[in-house]
Structure formats: structure tokens, C-alpha cells
């Protein structure tokens, strides 16, 4: 049987400008979790926008992947929700996402309904990534 690893995915790219980075980060993190690994997904900087409903639900408007239908947006959203529901850990940079008017008081209005969010800072970024065997950065 395969050895379990700790994976750390760091998304800082703006999903509206680099949708491929956002989608690949989600699909790779989901796959690592499905294969039985421990997986942390840390969104920071412009990457925090991936959790915004209006952004993830409209990825298909900024990428040719998925043929321009909303299927690719739905796949990304569902993958992230499933990732969260099945034990994937999601961190969001609290300072970064505040730039977009989202905070711990109003996030339920703005973000997709992931099971749990860790509101984090550079301290947690370093602590969590230092536990990883493998780091992906998008």
C-alpha cells in the first residue's frame, strides 16, 4: 500500500486572471485527498478570491477549458466543497480576503459553503507548510 504524505497547496494567483492555476490547484488537492493523503489548501493574496461564490461560479467566463459552459465552474466548486467535506483543510489569508470586503462576520454571504475555514496569517502559512512532504504553489 502507498505511504501517506502531507500535501500543501498554496494558491496566490487571481482566479479571474489565471483560472488554470486556480482550477489545477483544486483538482490536484482533491485528487491527493482521494488517494488518502493529508491535504491542506491555503489561499492567500488574490488566490483568496477562489472561495468567493461570484468568482468560482464564473470561472468558465475567463477560460476556454470546459468549452465555455458552466460545467468547469461547477466542477471546481463541487471539488472544493467535497474536499472540505471529506477532511481537506482550508486556510484563507484573513488579511488578503479582507481586501475584497470579506471577514469572519460576513463570509457566509460571500463564500462558498465549505465545511470549515481556518482564518490565517503568514505565521500559519509557515507552520502548516513546514509539516508538508510535498508543496504545490500556484
Region roles according to the model:
Residues 3-8:
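Extreme N-terminal starter segment of soluble prokaryotic enzymes
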Residues 9-22, 45, 51:
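Short, glycine-rich nucleotide/cofactor-binding loops
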Residues 11-15, 60-68, 106-112:
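Short, basic, glycine/proline-bearing loop/turn elements
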Residues 21-35, 41:
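Histidine-anchored nucleotide/phosphate-binding helix
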Residues 39-45, 90-94:
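Short internal beta-strands
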Residues 47-60:
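N-terminal beta-loop-helix "entrance" segment that forms/cooperates
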Residues 59-95:
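A glycine-rich helix N-cap at a beta->alpha junction
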Residues 79, 83-87, 91, 98-129:
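A short aromatic-anchored loop/beta-hairpin motif
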Amino acid at each position: 500500500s502507498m505511504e501517506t504524505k502531507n500535501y500543501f497547496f498554496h494558491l496566490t494567483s487571481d482566479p479571474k486572471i489565471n483560472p488554470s492555476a486556480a482550477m489545477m490547484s483544486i483538482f490536484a488537492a482533491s485528487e491527493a485527498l482521494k488517494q488518502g493523503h493529508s491535504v491542506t489548501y491555503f489561499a492567500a493574496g488574490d488566490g483568496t478570491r477562489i472561495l468567493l461564490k461570484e468568482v468560482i461560479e464564473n470561472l468558465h467566463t475567463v477560460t476556454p477549458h470546459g468549452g465555455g459552459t458552466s460545467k468547469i465552474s461547477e466542477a471546481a466548486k463541487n471539488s472544493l466543497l467535497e474536499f472540505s467535506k471529506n477532511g481537506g483543510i482550508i486556510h484563507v489569508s484573513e488579511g488578503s480576503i479582507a481586501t475584497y470586503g470579506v471577514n469572519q462576520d460576513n463570509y457566509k454571504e460571500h463564500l462558498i459553503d465549505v465545511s470549515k475555514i481556518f482564518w490565517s496569517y503568514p505565521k500559519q502559512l509557515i507552520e502548516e507548510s513546514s509539516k508538508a512532504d510535498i508543496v504545490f504553489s500556484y
